[in-house]
């Protein structure tokens, strides 16, 4: 090969390297986000806001693809997917993440929050920040705290008017230790099972009832098989908008910044959507023939004391509980 040919070959190599570098530098980052809710529910609205903010802040460098309705798996499977790299972002209920980050169990206690503003204060204040650090140590980056609704009790055959009415009933719960203990303390037979199996289990009398929020009681049409709806507010569920800490740190700084900004905006949208939905649905449910009762919470609160004794033992959990109750 003559000198002219060698020079041309070097030029082509350099140009190829530059083109490759340019294409890599400008390759779009695709993030897969999954949740188990319907597209018209608050979780999805929150994730749409995350997508909007992040894509805008990064000038299209990042694309967030959202998969609702458990397309990427159950909440537990999606949490595991973060570790495996098959899922980038998800928003499990706090109880399911507690299996990976035990410190989060404090948010699963019954009658912990007085009302929504109190819950948001705990999420966004010192307790939430402390729990965010605990998540980070276990490999999860918190982008924002969602809510999963104020929870009530549905039953298939008889209404719940007092704590005595729940005794002996098989009530579906999530597989969250504090939730299982709560319903056992109420006198029910707590029966953990997958959310996707619940409608059929109610229909076939495998369970006598379940706990849920107004929003998912309505959206999943549980009223068709469990028409008795007791407004007890036994807990207000926290949900965690998270991604893998490893994945988060692998992203460019501007993308990290956009995700954190988007996470806060996303949480604000999701919370408002949940509050608005909860407040507007009760009259619609009554119009559908749902039999709504308002049990006296006193007996439930008294029974809950045993759950606190069981789960609030460490100095750290006692400190966080004291901070929440003092807000």
Sequence positions of predicted segments:
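Extended hydrophobic/Leu-rich segments
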Residues: 12-13, 166
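Intrinsic-disorder/low-complexity regions
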Residues: 1-2, 25
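Sec/Tat signal peptide C-region and signal peptidase I cleavage site
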Residues: 7, 22-27
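N-terminal secretory/targeting leader peptides
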Residues: 28-118, 126-127, 133-327
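Positively charged n-region of N-terminal signal peptides that target proteins for export
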Residues: 2-11
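Bacterial N-terminal signal peptides
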Residues: 14-21
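Hydrophobic alpha-helical membrane context
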Residues: 21-22, 44
């Amino acid at each position: 090969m003559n000198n002219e040919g060698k020079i041309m070959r070097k030029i082509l190599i350099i140009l190829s390297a530059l083109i490759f570098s340019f294409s890599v530098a400008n390759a779009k980052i695709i993030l897969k986000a999954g949740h188990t809710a319907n597209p018209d529910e608050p979780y999805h609205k929150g994730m749409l806001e995350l997508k909007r903010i992040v894509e805008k802040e990064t000038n299209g460098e990042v694309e967030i693809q959202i998969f609702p309705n458990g397309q990427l798996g159950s909440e537990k499977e999606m949490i595991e997917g973060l570790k495996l790299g098959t899922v980038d972002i998800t928003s499990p209920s706090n109880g399911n993440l507690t299996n990976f980050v035990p410190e989060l169990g404090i948010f699963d206690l019954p009658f912990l929050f007085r009302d929504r503003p109190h819950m948001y204060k705990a999420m966004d204040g010192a307790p939430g920040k402390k729990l965010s650090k605990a998540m980070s140590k276990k490999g999860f980056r918190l982008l924002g705290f969602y809510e999963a609704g104020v929870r009530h009790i549905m039953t298939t055959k008889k209404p719940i008017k007092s704590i005595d009415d729940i005794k002996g009933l098989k009530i579906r719960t999530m597989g969250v230790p504090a939730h299982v203990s709560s319903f056992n303390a109420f006198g029910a037979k707590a029966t953990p099972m997958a959310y996707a199996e619940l409608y059929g289990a109610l229909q076939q009398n495998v369970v006598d009832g379940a706990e849920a929020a107004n929003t998912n009681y309505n959206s999943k049409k549980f009223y068709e098989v469990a028409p008795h709806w007791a407004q007890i507010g036994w807990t207000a569920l926290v949900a965690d908008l998270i991604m893998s800490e490893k994945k988060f740190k692998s992203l460019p700084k501007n993308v990290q910044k956009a995700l954190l900004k988007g996470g806060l905006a996303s949480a604000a949208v999701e919370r408002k959507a949940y509050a608005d939905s909860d407040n507007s649905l009760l009259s619609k449910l009554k119009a559908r023939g749902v039999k709504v009762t308002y049990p006296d919470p006193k007996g439930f609160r008294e029974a809950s004391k045993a759950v606190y004794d069981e789960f609030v033992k460490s100095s750290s959990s006692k400190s966080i509980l004291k901070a929440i109750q003092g807000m």
